[in-house]
Regions:
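Conserved Class I S-adenosyl-L-methionine
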Residues: 210-284
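Class I SAM-dependent methyltransferase SAM/SAH-binding core
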Residues: 77-78, 82-123
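A short glycine-rich, Lys/Arg-flanked "PGG" loop and its adjoining helix->strand segment in the class I
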Residues: 149-164
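Conserved class I S-adenosyl-L-methionine
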Residues: 2-62, 65-74, 164-187
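A short SAM/SAH-binding and catalytic strip from SAM-dependent methyltransferases
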Residues: 134-150
Length: 284
């Protein structure tokens, strides 16, 4: 099919559906409610999150009078620094575990200008749950929505300033790893990654939104107390159930993790795009 005839919203929906089906029907919000995933992520943010926060804050203009909407706020990676710079922040976070960590972080820091809305963005009622309009709307690595076009339309409906979407560009290190492990453990099994920034850009383009883009790399360290903890963690991630599968996974992991003092580290590398536009120049 010719590119100009492609329905990029449908492409996103199909790729996200395939990805979720591959994960047993688990969407992004449900993933963070498994075990200690949310708290583990916050530990990684504390170790490595400053790099991304600096990348973002160096690029955007935020004033003390601004009202900010943070979609998929997670543990407060951006909501916390935003609270020190803006008049008000609305943090939308669907995961029970992530929302719990977020509220704990806000309470520990005595932050009172952040409202938490614990819902999927798709389920948020713009009039009942929010207080629009917002000067700044941000969705940072939180675009796990199936219908991304509708999700963006909702963002634009509550914004009269800039909208920033941070998302992955190309294969992440965990995409590469998942393909290798799947082939090792299960043979010729198709791996379906989430749709990436190329699809997102084209969705926006077909909506009549011609965004600005900048590309930036990031890395994060996932630390474990022991090598056995790594094997147990990724054994669950990759559904390594038999002794043979566990042995193969153990050998694979021994080649890709690093010893770091008394702990072991899995390094994640990923290239990203920040896609943004001034919504005051768009028709919603």
């Amino acid at each position: 099919m010719a590119t100009y005839m492609m329905d990029w919203s449908a492409v996103w929906i199909d790729q996200m559906r395939r990805h979720n089906e591959m994960n047993g029907g688990m969407d992004c919000a449900a993933y963070w409610d498994v075990g200690e995933e949310a708290r583990n992520y916050w530990k990684m943010v504390e170790q490595d999150g400053e790099e991304f926060v600096k990348v973002l804050l160096d690029q955007i203009e935020i004033k003390s009078t601004f009202r900010v909407l943070d979609i998929g706020a997670g543990p407060g990676t951006l909501a916390i620094p935003f609270s020190n710079m803006a008049a008000h922040v609305t943090a939308v976070e669907p995961s029970d575990a992530m929302a719990s960590v977020l509220r704990e972080n806000l309470e520990e820091r005595g932050i009172e200008n952040v409202d938490c809305v614990q819902k999927k963005w798709e389920e948020v009622d713009l009039e009942r749950d929010l207080k629009p309009p917002y000067d700044l709307v941000v969705a940072s690595f939180s675009l796990g929505m199936t219908d991304i076009k509708r999700a963006i339309q909702k963002m634009m409906a509550v914004s009269f300033g800039r909208v920033y979407l941070a998302w992955f560009a190309g294969d992440t290190s965990w995409d590469v790893q998942a393909r290798e492990v799947s082939a090792l453990l299960f043979g010729d099994v198709a791996y379906h990654p989430m749709p990436k920034s190329d699809v997102l850009f084209n969705v926006l383009y077909q909506m009549g939104v011609y965004p600005n883009v900048w590309v930036f790399p990031l890395r994060m360290h996932h630390r474990f107390p022991s090598f056995d903890d790594i094997v147990n963690y990724f054994g669950g991630q990759y559904r390594a159930e038999t002794d043979d599968q566990r042995a193969k996974l153990r050998d694979y992991l021994s080649q890709v993790v690093e010893r770091d003092g008394d702990s072991w580290t899995m390094m994640y590398h990923f290239l990203n795009m920040m896609i943004w536009w001034d919504n005051s120049h768009q028709e919603t």
